[in-house]
A protein has these predicted regions:
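Active-site C-terminal subdomain of aminotransferase-like
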Residues: 24, 196-286
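Conserved PLP-binding catalytic core of the aspartate aminotransferase-like
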Residues: 296-326
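Active-site phosphate-binding strand-loop segment of PLP-dependent enzymes
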Residues: 125-179, 190
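PLP-dependent enzyme catalytic core of the Aspartate aminotransferase-like
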Residues: 15, 340, 344-373
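N-terminal "arm"/small-domain region of PLP-dependent enzymes with the aminotransferase-like
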Residues: 1-45
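Conserved N-terminal alpha-helix of the aminotransferase class I/II PLP-enzyme fold
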Residues: 37-87, 108, 112
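PLP-dependent aminotransferase-like
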Residues: 82-142
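Conserved active-site segment immediately N-terminal to the catalytic lysine
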Residues: 185-196, 206
Length: 373
């Protein structure tokens, strides 16, 4: 059985976590949870200064990391990106939206807006898994919904405002992209994500980098009288975020780990540093896949390959499931493919916390496993 294969210790990565979310958390960040002063935060009120100072640090850190233009704000709340699809449906789409769909997760927001009884029919532009479509300027569209990185397939797309769409908002699902891929904030109105990917924390929180136009849209929709449940009310989240707090109680460890990761990124050179680490890892993974006889990158167009989520197809003669099982038995975990894609492949998380040298060790470990199958 593949699980009986023993990979030599000298081949293994120093850290065997390659998941696409939850992802590797740096040991230094975990240590910060028990550092002097942490006990004044954990187990205390999120309405008081110790916790509010953490939220403030996160908001200021993300403003710096993404070089946000004047007027842009960092807004946060509970529920993760899944909640934000509903929040945006209720509070940012005025009537009609256009969605680019090229995988499981980019389809979720499209489904939410399509099912909303108070919105007009959305336009959905699809492409095959392993590719991404392009936005098209369209009359009557007030939100263009893009996805920076499709986590299920390992496809990334450049974020740029579609030409001829003045007055419409550009909303970007950056769940697995934020912090690991470069982006220009002037090209979006809302860039939303969760902290369990590049930001090496736990899930359950959403964060949104919002332009003045997006905030104004939220205020306009709220004033229109549209019924919005309080938990999904973006105006309430904005109001609380400006006070460095969330509407309801957040997971404090999640906030603290997020804060540690943002500080680490900024201290080492900001987004250029963080995205550079992921790019280095991706270069090693795809370079190995292209030169290895039994593997090929799933995304055939190099320009569309993700630097944070790598999907690698295996020759039909090799069962990628068996490879993943052998890796897991050796402490190298979460390399399994996205379940609904149905491909004979591995999916590798290459977020900034992952040491690029560990990607080399991972590929050496895969080669060893395949040689023993």
């Amino acid at each position: 059985m593949s699980a009986d294969i023993q990979i030599p210790e000298n081949l293994k990565p120093r850290d065997g976590r390659f998941g696409c979310g939850p992802s590797k958390i740096r040991p230094e960040a975990l240590a910060a949870l028990t550092a002097p002063g942490a006990n004044y935060i954990l187990g205390t009120s999120h309405r008081q200064k110790p916790v509010k100072n953490v939220v403030k640090s996160v908001r200021e850190g993300l403003t710096s990391l993404f070089s946000l233009p004047d007027g842009y704000e960092v807004i946060l709340g509970n529920g993760g990106s899944t909640a934000f699809w509903d929040i945006a449906t209720l509070g940012l789409i005025e009537d009609r939206s256009q969605h680019l769909v090229f995988g499981e997760f980019s389809s979720k927001f499209a489904s939410a807006s399509k099912e909303a009884p108070f919105l007009g029919e959305p336009t959905v532009i699809k492409s095959e898994p392993g590719t991404h479509p392009e936005a098209v300027a369209e009359a009557g569209i007030d939100v263009y919904a893009l996805t920076h990185n499709e986590t299920s397939t390992g496809v990334s797309m450049p974020i740029k405002r579609p030409a001829g769409t003045d007055g419409a908002l550009v909303l970007v699902d950056a769940t697995s992209a934020a912090g690991g891929l470069d982006v220009n904030a002037k090209e979006f109105d809302t860039y939303y994500f969760a902290p369990q990917k590049s930001f090496a924390s736990d899930g359950g929180l959403w964060l949104a980098l919002m332009s003045p136009a997006a905030i104004a849209r939220s205020e306009k929709i709220k004033a229109s009288g549209r019924w919005i449940p309080a938990f999904f009310d973006l105006s309430i989240a904005i109001e609380n975020s400006r006070l460095d707090q969330t509407y309801n109680t957040p997971a404090l460890i999640t906030l603290m780990l997020l804060d540690e990761q943002v500080k680490w990124m900024n201290a080492n050179g900001g987004l250029k540093f963080a995205a550079g680490r992921s790019a280095d890892s991706a270069s090693r993974l795809y370079g190995w896949a292209e030169k290895t006889s039994y593997t090929t990158p799933f995304v055939t167009n190099p320009a569309q390959r993700s630097n944070v989520v790598g999907t690698i197809n295996f020759d039909d003669a090799i069962d990628a499931t068996a490879v993943a099982a052998a890796l897991r038995a050796n402490g190298i975990v979460d390399t399994e493919p996205y379940r609904k894609l149905g491909k004979n492949q591995l999916r590798i998380g290459m977020f900034p916390a992952v040491d690029p040298a560990d990607i080399d060790a991972l590929t050496a470990s895969i080669d060893f496993v395949v040689s023993k199958l």
